[in-house]
Amino acid sequence: MTKNDIIKAAFRVWGRELYQSTSLTTLARELGVSKPAIYRHFQDKQALLNAMHETFFDEYAAFIKPWYERAVAAQDAVESLFIMMRTIVDYYARNVDAFLFSLIQVYGDPIVGARDMTAHLNRRGVDLSSLSRFEADTQTYPSMVQLILATLTFIMAHFHKHEHTLDDHPSEERIRYIIALTEKKVADGLGFNKEMVEAIDYEGLENRIAGTVHDLEEDCLLRAVAGAVAEAGPWNASMEMVARRSGLSKSSLYSHFKNKQDMLRQLFLTEFDRIVRFADLGKQHSTVPEEQLYLVIIAMADYLRSRPEILVAIDWIRTRRLDLGHIAVSSRIYQVITDIQGLGSTGEQDPSGSVSAWIPQWILFLIVNTLMRRPAGMAFSELPNSSIRVLFKFIVSGIKGCTL
């Protein structure tokens, strides 16, 4: 057994549970060895995780570097970005273990993770920031590069969730399909008319719903739950932490929640209901489909900007699987968005082949991603509406709807 054997097995074994557990005992059982046999190669679990980081970046950079050089040399801005997008989708479609590792271990912290990725790739001769030279305004946030990477991450997650188990591999036909689907979504978004999107009175729409997120009575107990989740994550947030934040005793909490799972479930169900409520209220301020969708997006963004602990809690379930029973997140958001004329019958398919129920989830994913990856040092509430407008234009018209 070599160090590389252990590293490869760790990607496979810990990835199955999305790194909820990184047990050396489980890893040793998978390899058919004792834990001391692993310790002969790695001093401790952190040393193994560090080696996994190096292996991931070595293999990832080696795969994309030839195509990165072609992208940098390309004169056409769109083609440059698409070369890299196709390459990254190709790599992650073929390497689910690497995808899961990057999603959770590298991007686990939205801001630190992005810096970590950039630094590691730079040391290996891949400077993705150089592609921003193709954008007209490199100070605009979010950048096209960020929105493209977020979109392919979302599509990859759905692809691997619906296509196959973690122990088999997608066919070449399905890999070509997912590359084409990602390219179409990035290029065209939802296919809205660019001129109509540009003609929207964004400031007027924003003023119509300004302040409405503060009209809903707060549930102080659930806010304490959200604060604990934001602080420690859903796996490590405890009833004791919630009791301390709420001023209640742990025994008193059991009169509100059956157990920790029920506590988390109530939190997420309540918050998704609130998000959908504000989205629906926002939509009612216009009868124009393009305006309605922007009102939905700005209403959801407003709510999350005003509730940072809720935003961070939702970000946890954006990247991690939680055993909370059936939470019909998509059905709630799906109805609000697909009721908008032209979105309920797009006929588009998701990576599993079903009709476009994934579009509302993609929209929420991009909203959360944009807020969580805001510029360093900026509070959630400080993210300007201009950033939400950039996000909206990308969603409805793709990069064709944004100025490069």
Role assignments for model-derived ranges:
Residues 50-56, 264-271, 314:
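Alpha-helical DNA-contacting segments of helix-turn-helix folds
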Residues 5, 13-47, 51, 228, ...:
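Helix-turn-helix
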Residues 86-114, 157-161, 301-324, 369-376:
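Amphipathic alpha-helical segments used for helix-helix packing
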Residues 126-133, 157-223, 227, 231-232, ...:
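C-terminal peripheral helix-coil segments that are non-catalytic and often amphipathic
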Residues 51, 66-94, 281-306:
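Hydrophobic alpha-helical connector segments
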Residues 1-2, 6-9, 144, 217-224, ...:
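N-terminal positioning helix adjacent to the helix-turn-helix/winged-helix DNA-binding module
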Residues 260, 274-275, 282, 286, ...:
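C-terminal functional regions that serve as terminal interaction/effector modules
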Residues 110-136, 142-146, 173, 177, ...:
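Amphipathic alpha-helical packing segments from all-alpha helical-bundle domains
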